[in-house]
């Protein structure tokens, strides 16, 4: 909460600066951004100048920033709290009854080779999330309600105006991307049909979409955390020593929180800290090849921040559409290596899945 409050204060200061930049005459601005002290920041400052033209009064922008602490950010934190209380009961084969966190349950539901296990977890997963459905619905509605009120205050008639600006793309670009996806989705649909056939089903259930495919005597491999790290470092080194050395240091310095324990939300996450020039990674590692890919993915995020560590802060800000490039590339290094080293067609099919 303290960090969010500090960020709110920073936003208010930045808003004032953006408006002052916008007020500078065009000729003076052209001369200013050519000065050595500002030329390196010309792109970021020019972007701020454009943003300043759509801002409200200082008082109104300050009010929005302060309301965001217990409004937009508050509801987001509320969602995280709700997820931390999710418990998925599951009876193991030996009769032991465990309570899985949302993160543990999701990993097992997607990665367990036994379809009966996946189905049992899915049923309990639906019950657990369904029990809190009204609270989640309220959370999502209030998050979106705050966002729409913000857009209306700034006279953004289309809800995509702000996301497009943030991601630095045009509406035509987004539309073209979706058109390309729609026009080329058939191979993906054919893949899902083929996967269902290989699993002996007419169609895939939700918990089968990401499930492993085990053909013949092949069973999906599992890895300890150390084995996954060793594999990742080895194949990162094939791309370049800087990526490998950085990733090894990140693990040795305990930047990765991957413990398989209760109370954790699903998925992986990486956060960078510009003051210390370090990153921290959050995930739940349960030993699957998918978990190894997630670890590689998050290390890719951390390396992205690392290579920009000496740039001015304003030049290190990028949106999600750029953020996923380094991480996806790092993940692909590992995925390609596992497929390349597969010892049988059955293993290769499992990995390609």
Please describe what each predicted stretch is.
Residues 1-219:
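A well-structured
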Residues 155, 286-307, 327, 332:
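Active-site recognition of the HExxH zinc-binding catalytic motif
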Residues 156-161, 204-208, 268-278, 298-309, ...:
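Active-site-adjacent bridging/hinge elements
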Residues 219-227, 238, 274-296:
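Short pre-active-site segment immediately N-terminal to the catalytic Zn-binding motif
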Residues 234, 238-245, 271, 301-312, ...:
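Conserved helix-loop functional segments at active or binding sites
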Residues 314-326:
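Active-site metal-coordination segments of metallo-dependent hydrolases
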């Amino acid at each position: 909460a303290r960090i969010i409050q500090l960020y709110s204060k920073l936003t208010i200061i930045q808003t004032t600066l953006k408006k002052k930049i916008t007020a500078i005459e065009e000729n003076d601005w052209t001369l200013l951004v050519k000065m050595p002290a500002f030329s390196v920041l010309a792109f970021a400052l020019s972007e701020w100048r454009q943003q300043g033209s759509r801002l409200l009064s200082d008082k109104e922008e300050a009010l929005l920033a302060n309301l965001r602490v217990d409004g937009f950010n508050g509801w987001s934190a509320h969602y995280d709290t709700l997820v931390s209380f999710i418990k998925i009961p599951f009876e193991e084969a030996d009769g032991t009854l465990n309570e899985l966190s949302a993160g543990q349950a999701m990993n097992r539901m997607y990665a367990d080779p036994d379809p009966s296990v996946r189905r049992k977890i899915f049923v309990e997963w639906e019950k657990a999330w369904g029990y809190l459905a009204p609270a989640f619905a309220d959370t999502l509605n209030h998050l979106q309600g705050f966002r729409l009120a913000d857009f209306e205050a700034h006279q953004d008639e289309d809800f995509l105006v702000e996301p497009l600006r943030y991601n630095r793309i045009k509406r035509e670009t987004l539309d073209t991307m979706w058109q390309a996806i729609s026009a080329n989705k058939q191979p993906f649909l054919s893949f899902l049909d083929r996967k269902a056939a290989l699993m002996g089903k007419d169609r895939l259930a939700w918990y089968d979409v990401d499930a492993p495919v085990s053909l013949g005597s092949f069973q999906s491999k599992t890895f300890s955390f150390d084995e996954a790290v060793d594999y990742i470092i080895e194949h990162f080194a094939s791309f370049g020593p800087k990526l490998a050395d950085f990733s090894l240091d990140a693990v040795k310095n305990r930047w990765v929180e991957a413990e398989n324990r209760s109370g954790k939300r699903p998925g992986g996450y990486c956060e960078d800290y510009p003051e210390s020039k370090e990153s921290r990674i959050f995930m739940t590692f349960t030993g699957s090849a998918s978990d190894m890919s997630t670890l590689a993915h998050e290390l890719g995020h951390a390396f992205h921040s690392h290579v920009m560590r000496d740039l001015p802060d304003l030049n290190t800000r990028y949106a999600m559409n750029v953020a996923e490039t380094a991480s996806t590339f790092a993940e692909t290094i590992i995925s390609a290596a596992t497929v390349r080293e597969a010892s049988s067609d059955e293993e290769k099919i499992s990995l390609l899945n």
